[in-house]
A protein has these predicted regions:
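Rhodanese-like catalytic fold shared by cysteine-dependent sulfurtransferases
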Residues: 2-6, 15-27, 31, 54-85, ...
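Short coil/turn segments at beta-strand junctions that form active-site/ligand-binding loops
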Residues: 40-44, 79-81
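Short hydrophobic beta-strand that contains or immediately precedes a catalytic carboxylate
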Residues: 43-48, 61
Length: 132
């Protein structure tokens, strides 16, 4: 019985940690993101790699792959400023790498754009191409 109780406690803890991690970086909707872009109150981080970044990115996004060593220099001074990371699509979790790095620098308003570049393109929104 003690083993069973210990197993249940362990499973419960694991599930609660997984659930907490899932919402660690809340999603931002397409309309919220475009409003923040229009107001110029967001820093966007593309986590798709440099080749993908040059092939098409959300306008104004920075390339995480080229900034890893100097990410802090590309971010706003205000640690409460909105920072949004995105990757390929809704199934992609690569955004977490950048989001965690940003949070580790002390930023408190870190979100992710779940549809990623695929969803952005599917919405008909413009993309930037080439080097920044």
């Amino acid at each position: 019985m003690k083993r069973f109780s210990a197993l249940l406690c362990t499973l419960g803890l694991a599930c609660s940690l997984f659930a907490a991690g899932k919402d660690e970086f809340p999603a931002i909707s397409h309309s919220e993101l475009t409003a923040a872009m229009t107001a110029q109150t967001v820093t966007l981080i593309d986590v798709n790699g440099t080749a993908s970044y040059r092939n098409g990115r959300i306008p104004g996004a920075i390339d995480y792959a080229t900034l890893r060593g100097d990410l802090a220099a590309a971010l706003p001074k205000d640690k409460g400023a909105l920072v949004v990371a995105y990757c390929g699509n809704e199934k992609c979790q690569a955004y977490r790498t950048a989001a965690k790095a940003v949070a580790a620098l002390g930023y408190t308003n870190v979100k992710h754009y779940s549809p990623g570049i695929a969803g952005w393109r599917a919405s008909g929104a413009a993309v930037e191409k080439g080097a920044p």
